[in-house]
């Protein structure tokens, strides 16, 4: 019995305990909601004050700007009136001076001409206005009553009532969207049949927000009822129809945009049809929501999808040949050898971009003195960049350092400090030089200009043999001497042009003797004697260098060098391996050509060294 009574007593005490715990939990939740609301009100207070300050400050700036504008207008009106009155005063002063002169002359002498002048001055006086031509009244009118009323009634503060069902789940996520509304706009409560606040469709669209004021980020609701599908009322059906119209308009705009893109792509495709290959591509349109695009059956996708695979295959050979020709064009483009040469190190090309320490005695070795001033140079504007691009390949006809007559040469002609600008004199001399005249205007025989590519190649190649020979070359041969040499060659027997039979093996020590005898026989024959003084460069077809053909040295007899190469080839192991016939090589020039290609002996003996003359 006692146990039953204890159980009944405990069950009777449990119900009040549960009620107390529920009430305490509700109170704690309510207190938490109130505290959060208080904190949100404080935050909202700061936001509203910031909005008020920003709005008032901006309108005060507008008033200040209006004040400055009115000051400028007053100054402008004052200047106009002052100029008008000054012109009138000048005319009156001029006429007053004339009357003073006439009065003085009339007091001294009596002359009829003076009477005529007096009448003219009186007529001018009658035509002038003696009163000020412009008024001196300048007033400022302001509708202070309207301005004061507008200022006193400017702005308003409104608040909204939070729905009860949201107060039950009071949280920052639920209260936030209602507290972050604009300060000057109040949203009336719109309850649907289910009791949920219906938000208009316009609130879901991206609209213009005020520039000032902090907008809290959107936080999704934690209430499950907000995520369930609600029954559509009349207003909800209207908003859904507006959504359909909106998406239809978006789809129509996209469709028109695709048609516009189709035209431009087709036109550009037709332009580049014969020039370059076009890769197949297609334009895909995203579906906007679940709404179908209008007029989808009327429009075929093939009308705006561009897929030119077949035409691309047909044009492939032609375009391939064109691409090949474009690639070969690169081989014939002009180039500058200086682009391949090593550039001089900049004095700022070190770690930390700090200039190197240079002694005063070695300042002349610096190539980039202006690099130290790069930090002080102003930033280049687009116009300056365009000018630099236009003049990057421009070469001045004369240098300032070579022309300037000042003690310290100027950096440019514009900064020349001479009495007469050096640029004019230098330009005059340059024009005379271009016309083929000297400084006195007399015509001068033009000197042949050396080839440009040779100068560029000599910058980084070893000095060539021709350049050395040209410095030591004698005067040009006369035409009669060339004709005599040609006559000697024409009358020479054909046996002189054939290759001699090779020498037998077993007597290697006699080879130098036979070569000496062969050399002596060469000098004894009239043809060989004529070749010694005969310059073969006169028989070579010249390029652009017409004046330096006869400057080659006659001591370097190339015909003898070719015959010497024959003998070296016939006595070399190459002849023993292949057993070439005596007339295998033909003329000496052909022999020399193939010897350069097939000779396996040490080329240092005859290719890079000049053979000794016998």
Curated annotation (Swiss-Prot):
Q: Which UniProt keywords apply?
A: Activator, Chromosomal rearrangement, Chromosome, Cytoplasmic vesicle, Lysosome, Nucleus, Proto-oncogene, Transcription, Transcription regulation, Ubl conjugation
Q: Where is this region: Interaction with ferritin heavy chain FTH1?
A: 383-522
Q: What does this protein do?
A: Cargo receptor for the autophagic turnover of the iron-binding ferritin complex, playing a central role in iron homeostasis. Acts as an adapter for delivery of ferritin to lysosomes and autophagic degradation of ferritin, a process named ferritinophagy. Targets the iron-binding ferritin complex to autolysosomes following starvation or iron depletion. Ensures efficient erythropoiesis, possibly by regulating hemin-induced erythroid differentiation.
Q: Which GO BP annotation is one of this protein's?
A: male gonad development
Taxonomic source organism: Homo sapiens (Human)
Q: Where is this site: Breakpoint for rearrangement to form RET/PTC3 oncogene?
A: 238-239
Region listing for Disordered, in residue ranges: 501-524
Q: Which GO terms describe its molecular function?
A: transcription coactivator activity
Factors inducing expression: Down-regulated by nutrient deprivation (at protein level).
- Provide the tissue specificity: Widely expressed. Also detected in adipose tissues and in different cell lines. Isoform Beta is only expressed in testis.
Q: Which InterPro entries match?
A: NCoA-4, NCOA4_N
Q: Which Pfam families match?
A: ARA70
Write down what this protein is called. Answer: Nuclear receptor coactivator 4
């Amino acid at each position: 019995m006692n146990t039953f009574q204890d159980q009944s007593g405990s069950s009777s005490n449990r119900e009040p305990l549960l009620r107390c715990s529920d009430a305490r939990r509700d109170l704690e939740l309510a207190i938490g909601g109130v505290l959060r609301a208080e904190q949100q009100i404080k935050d909202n207070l700061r936001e509203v004050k910031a909005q008020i300050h920003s709005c008032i400050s901006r309108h005060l700036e507008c008033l200040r700007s209006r004040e400055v504008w009115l000051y400028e207008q007053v100054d402008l009106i004052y200047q106009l009136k002052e100029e008008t009155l000054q012109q009138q005063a000048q005319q009156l002063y001029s006429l007053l001076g004339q009357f003073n002169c006439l009065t003085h002359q009339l007091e001294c002498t009596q002359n009829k001409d003076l009477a005529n002048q007096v009448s003219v001055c009186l007529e001018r006086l009658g035509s002038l206005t003696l009163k000020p031509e412009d008024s001196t009244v300048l007033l400022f009118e302001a509708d202070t009553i309207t301005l004061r009323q507008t200022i006193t009634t400017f702005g308003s503060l409104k608040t909204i009532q939070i729905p009860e069902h949201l107060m039950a789940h009071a949280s920052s996520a639920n209260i936030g969207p209602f507290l972050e509304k604009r300060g000057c706009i109040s949203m009336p409560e719109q309850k649907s049949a289910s009791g949920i606040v219906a938000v208009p469709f316009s609130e879901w669209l991206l609209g213009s927000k005020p520039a000032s004021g902090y907008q809290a980020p959107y936080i999704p609701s934690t209430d499950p009822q907000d995520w369930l599908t609600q029954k559509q009322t009349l207003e909800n059906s209207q908003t859904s129809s507006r959504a359909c119209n909106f998406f239809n308009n978006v789809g129509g705009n996209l469709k028109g945009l695709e048609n516009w893109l189709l035209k431009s792509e087709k036109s550009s495709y037709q332009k580049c049809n014969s020039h370059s290959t076009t890769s197949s591509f297609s334009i895909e349109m995203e579906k906007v929501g679940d709404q179908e695009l209008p007029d989808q059956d009327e429009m075929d996708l093939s009308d705006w999808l561009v897929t030119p695979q077949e035409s691309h295959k047909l044009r492939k050979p032609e375009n391939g040949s064109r691409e090949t020709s474009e690639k070969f064009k690169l081989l014939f483009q002009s180039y500058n050898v200086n682009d391949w040469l090593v550039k001089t190190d900049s004095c700022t090309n070190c770690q930390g971009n700090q200039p190197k320490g240079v002694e005063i005695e070695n300042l002349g070795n610096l190539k980039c003195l202006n690099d130290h001033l790069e930090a002080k140079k102003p930033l280049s504007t687009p116009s300056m960049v365009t000018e630099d691009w236009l003049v990057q390949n421009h070469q001045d006809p004369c240098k300032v350092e070579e022309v300037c007559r000042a003690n310290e040469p100027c950096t440019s002609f514009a900064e020349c400090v001479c009495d007469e600008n050096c640029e004019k004199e230098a330009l005059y001399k340059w024009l005379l030089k271009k016309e083929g005249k000297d400084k006195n205007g007399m015509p001068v025989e033009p000197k042949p200009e050396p080839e440009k590519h040779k100068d560029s190649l000599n910058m980084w190649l070893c000095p060539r043999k021709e350049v050395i020979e040209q410095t030591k070359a004698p005067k040009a041969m006369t035409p009669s001497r060339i004709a005599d040499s040609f006559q000697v060659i024409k009358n020479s027997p054909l046996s002189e042009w054939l290759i001699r039979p090779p020498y037998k093996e077993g007597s290697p020590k006699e080879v130098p003797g036979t070569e000496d005898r062969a050399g002596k026989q060469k000098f004894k024959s009239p043809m060989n004697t004529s070749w010694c003084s005969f310059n073969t460069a006169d028989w070579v077809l010249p390029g652009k260098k017409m004046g330096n053909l006869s400057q080659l040295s006659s001591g370097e007899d190339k015909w003898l060098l070719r015959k010497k190469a024959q003998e070296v080839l016939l006595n070399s192991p190459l002849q023993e391996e292949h057993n070439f016939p005596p007339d295998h090589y033909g003329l000496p020039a052909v022999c020399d050509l193939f010897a350069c290609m097939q000779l396996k002996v040490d080329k240092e003996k005859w290719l890079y060294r000049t053979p000794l003359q016998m």
